[in-house]
Amino acid sequence: MRFSSIFKIIILNIFISKMAHAAVCEERYPADSEECQYVQELEQKAEQGDESAQFSLGSWYAEGRYVKPDYKLAIKWLEKAGKQGSDFSYFILGYHYNYGENFPLSRQKALEWYRKAAELGDSSTQEILGDAYMYGDGFPQNTQLALEWYRKAASPTNDAGVVRGQGSASSAQFKLGVMYAHGQGVPQDYQQTAILMRKAAENMYYPAQLYLGVAYFYGEGVPQDYRQAVYWLNEGIPGSYTPGHIPLNALYDKAHPADRVHSQTWYRKTAQRVMAKVQYNFGVWYYNGYHLLKDHNLALEWYRRAAAQGLAEAQDAIGVMFMQGEGVSQDYQQALAWYRKAARQGLAAAQTHLGIMSAFGRGVAQSDRQAIAWYRKAAKQDFAKAQYQLGVAYSTGRGVPENSRNALKWYLKAAEQGFTPAQSALGEIYAHGRQGVPKDNKQAYIWYYMASMYTEKSKDDCSALIAERNRLKGTLTPDQLSETYAAFNLIWRKIDQSKEAKKIARKKY
């Protein structure tokens, strides 16, 4: 009798387990489908302790692949895989918490999981922790702990190539080099900076190549050598490398094999021509905190160096800093003066900024008509921000007659260049059926998803964007989601080919 009861319990548990497996999958696929059978087989392997099965199953619950997204089940299986040594399992948990992808958005929980991956030796999460301590993002700012994690990530054992999220050990080597250059947590040491930059530069990390080129130009940590400066600056200029690319110094040596008298003069002049763009790049990095710790004073210093050589982008950047009072006291007249210098050279960004100044009457008489004139000049150059501003103008009827079709046209042009505010605007239009278009949750989800990938909004705004994206996802069937992802990929390919997307890619590098 007792044996019979135990047997019944065992049979009942097996039945409940099978029903649970089916229920999990039936929300997406028929119970007798290959997909559901695959999920059941994988879960059985995972229950038996198979690390690979635990990782795959956890990833599917995190992503909503084959099964309904369930972050609690994702944690269950990925943590089991992590305990068996799968650092990537912990990385995935950190990633989903960090970006709110089917998980509650939580920087603190993301860092907890990233730390587990880092302690297992994952270089990308070691660098993420270094950044968190360096910038005080999720942890109290602590340069000593930042150094500790950067050193682990920069270890030669991590030099094999590209790793998750950050690039390679080269990125951490670069950050360590900058800390030595500025004496952050360590005594200032330009020679150590040069050593670290060379390691990263030789691994094709372009920020380090540029930094090393500047070091050779000024003789900081290395002997002054214009030939080496030209070589590394040329290697590091984003987009300069093409198949069959030959450095400028090699071209000079080939053309003048015996001429060494004038070589340093030639290299110096060549380096000077390149230097303005490099100085501007450093300004951008300091301004935004890309590759370097955010510092508006240092950003302004580098921008001024480049602007003194007539670089329009640097002139516009200084205008932005005066406009917003970053690193300097807010001064609309100074902003206008710098914008006009850049706009005279035809820079679309400066033309757009002059349009915004006119629209809001900052430093000049308010004029919607003048604003539209500046926006049109910049939009003719395919400048996404100007296209977006024209979309806003046609949407609200400021400076032009209100026109829903034109508003949608300009928003779409900007969005397809990767401009986040335009993508967000399209998401809202399709989600609520505005601007004369019918409500379309698939299109709304696509554009909100795009916007959430590279948003520069505040954390609160970003959370709202992600929440709306996830809400829309929940309204779509599996077939609709498949169609939506296919459409997303087509649009993304367009964006990836645009100039704006290249800027985003360099920013994220």
Task: Go through each PLM region and give its residues.
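Bacterial N-terminal signal peptides
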Residues: 8-18
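Hydrophobic face of amphipathic alpha-helices that form TPR/SEL1-like repeat modules
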Residues: 24-25, 56-63, 67, 92-99, ...
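Canonical positions in the second alpha-helix
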Residues: 43-45, 80-81, 116-117, 152-153, ...
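Short helix-capping/linker turns of helical repeat alpha-solenoids
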Residues: 47-50, 63-65, 70, 83-86, ...
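Terminal, low-structured helical/coil segments at or just beyond the last alpha-helical repeat
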Residues: 460-509
